[in-house]
Amino acid sequence: MEEIKMDRIEDAIADFKEGKFVIVVDDEDRENEGDLIIAAEKITPEKVNFMLKHARGVLCAPITVSRCKELDLPHQVSDNTSVLGTPFTVTIDKLEGCSTGVSASDRAATIQALADPASTPATFGRPGHINPLYAQEKGVLRRAGHTEATIDMARLAGLYPAGALMEIMSDDGTMARLPELRAMADEHGLKLISIHDLIAYRLKQESIVEKGVEVNMPTEHGMFRLIPFRQKSNGLEHMAIFKGTWNEDEPILVRVHSSCATGDILGSHRCDCGEQLHKAMEMIEKEGKGVVVYLNQEGRGIGLMEKMKAYKLQEDGMDTVDANLCLGHLADERDYGVGAQILRELGVHKMKLLTNNPVKRVGLEAYGLEIVENVPVETVPNPYNERYLRTKKERMGHTLHFNK
């Protein structure tokens, strides 16, 4: 099959700055779809009409979390159970100068108002015909989605961080795939880029971690090396524990492990985190080379205080997923972008990933890392964590096995 040509990110940024559309595609393991994106301040009724005619999907308007708060745009639902956690807010229409809100001119006016610093909550009526979307603050380095790609493109182009996007559908109503997207881009003189390439571009342009000093680290599993890393955006400190040497094209064992004070330090039986960490280190010691990236992301990213609240809800009958959702969190709020950059700093590009979690694989692959094999880290359930592990298997898709 002929490889589909993608355009340079630099050329796409230049077009975006001029108010042209760009087509953005994501990973095959994610939505495997293309979106038509444009800067909010560059939208016109004619461009809205082009999107409705040629893309045919749902017209959405990505904006930043801070902008959502400024405009008092809450999440559309308190319990987001969509597959990819698409972060819709309540729908809106611009009030002044618009009629029903559904025409191309009304929709363009609403999107333009999102990029107008003078707009306030009173500028918009709710509900309406435009779907704003919360974009993660660190863009595609936090979440490899079209929403974040739109905001990143606006920022890279020096424009207001707001945009419009629409999924591209084929004439028969199915989602357009890469060959058709390339043909559409060529027909209309548009640039076609991938989120994968946008991530790689940002990682080359930006460093999100500061590397510390490397030291020896003797452990019960053998002699390792340790390097701390500080995340520049929030000061969080992470570490890489590794041994051996490798070539850039050599797949090595990698465990990306989120901190669990209760499991890793106290040996808690409520989870299997500590067991997975030690098993991973044993496997790396046996292999003679490999990396554990230890991320400071307690409680799947919600922190120790919130994790204890979730534990209390679990004691009252909820499972681990519903407890997070009840507290206003996603089921999993971890950021794999920082882990990906740490691995790149260590010269790791191909890996045999030590995980039971399919989301972790997708999260790392989105940042340009190649996973040649998933290596499960099986643990033995105990009476305190069996329900937790079953929830991870049944509701989060983890690869786990239980004795009948």
UniProtKB/Swiss-Prot annotation:
SUPFAM superfamilies: RibA-like (SSF142695), YrdC/RibB (SSF55821). It comes from Bacteroides thetaiotaomicron (strain ATCC 29148 / DSM 2079 / JCM 5827 / CCUG 10774 / NCTC 10582 / VPI-5482 / E50). Zn(2+) binds at C260, C271, C273. It catalyses: D-ribulose 5-phosphate = (2S)-2-hydroxy-3-oxobutyl phosphate + formate + H(+); GTP + 4 H2O = 2,5-diamino-6-hydroxy-4-(5-phosphoribosylamino)-pyrimidine + formate + 2 phosphate + 3 H(+). D-ribulose 5-phosphate binds at R30, E31, D35, R143, A144, G145, H146, T147, E167. GO terms for molecular function: 3,4-dihydroxy-2-butanone-4-phosphate synthase activity; GTP binding; GTP cyclohydrolase II activity; magnesium ion binding; manganese ion binding; zinc ion binding. Residues 1-204 are annotated as: DHBP synthase. Keywords: GTP-binding, Hydrolase, Lyase, Magnesium, Manganese, Metal-binding, Multifunctional enzyme, Nucleotide-binding, Riboflavin biosynthesis, Zinc. Binds 2 divalent metal cations per subunit. Magnesium or manganese. Binds 1 zinc ion per subunit. Its EC number is 4.1.99.12, 3.5.4.25. This is Riboflavin biosynthesis protein RibBA. GTP binds at R255, V256, H257, S258, S259, Q276, E298, G299, R300, T320, T355, K360. Pfam families: DHBP_synthase, GTP_cyclohydro2. InterPro entries: DHBP_synth_RibB-like_a/b_dom, DHBP_synthase_RibB, GTP_cyclohydro_II, RibA, RibA-like_sf, Riboflavin_synth_RibBA. Residues 205-404 are annotated as: GTP cyclohydrolase II. Mg(2+) 1 binds at E31. GO terms for biological process: riboflavin biosynthetic process. CDD domains: GTP_cyclohydro2 (cd00641). Its cofactor is Mg(2+); Mn(2+); Zn(2+).
